[in-house]
Amino acid sequence: MVLIICVFLAFLVYRFIELYARAQKSYVFALILLVAMIFTGLLGIAIQKDKLGLNSKRDFAQVLNFELFALADPLKHDDIHTKTLFEKFNINRNSATNEQRMSLIKANTADLNENLNLIMGDSHAYFLGIEILKNDKKFKSIVSAASTCPFSFDENTDYRKCRAFIRDFESKLLSSPNIKRLFITALANDATILGQTKNYKIYEQYLDDLFKILSNKNYAVYFIIDTPNLTFEPISCVQRYLNDIKIKPTCFLARDLYDEQTKIYKKMVKKISAKYPKITIIDPTPVFCDDKKCVIFENGKPLYGDTNHLTPLGEKKLFNEIKKYIKDFE
């Protein structure tokens, strides 16, 4: 269509601009046509750009009107409670090393004498923790996580030795006698586990050691299986034509593919958790998947911001599922 318009305008340019110029007659109509041609050209560029989709996560968030979590520099977002905890534990956060920038910490209290939720793990735990922190009216919450770093009591494990900064902070938190609930979650599926360990047995041993220690604690422990991970960016699901926004109908993760991606991981969790019944296992699969597919959008709003991080809407759905397992939640 744009090509046809351009050909037609080219004829008009020849007929009413070039011929007018040669005849040295009025240039008013010629100027109008020139402006129209430039406008149409720019319009064509805009249409073509829309057909190519969205260019960034920021575009993705703005076009679909949802909040986008920012991980760029958590250090800039420390609140007064977090800073007070650092001072209390005599931890220096001001050196701003890369390790510390990747430490995701949030709190709505610095008083360890209060009844506490602790949420620990990697960036997945951090985003879930923000939702718990905002909604739990009974207990205060402290979120302590490190990007790409699972929770562990034992740094001698062969599985993912993690940053000393976050482990030092967590060891001090875990000494509090007023912990009432501990939530643990992290990125995990068959591919990521194998990529990190080269051997599933290493992860299985890590999980067994972790559950063994947690089963002896005097607070409730919730281990949350990771949400489905996508095989594509959700940004690719959006089609735009000027102001018309559509989600591709084929934009979902096939359930059988998801089950295949997590078969070994879930089998290990099931096997080990059977030995430690005190630990509550929460599988959020039913929240996002039916027997055919796992959804990525709900009423035109994305549940995922990228391949493995949920949007605030997605986290809210996950949190509502977790609440069902907590008897005393207010």
How does the language model describe each region?
Residues 1-11, 15-330:
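Extracellular/periplasmic envelope-modification machinery, especially enzymes
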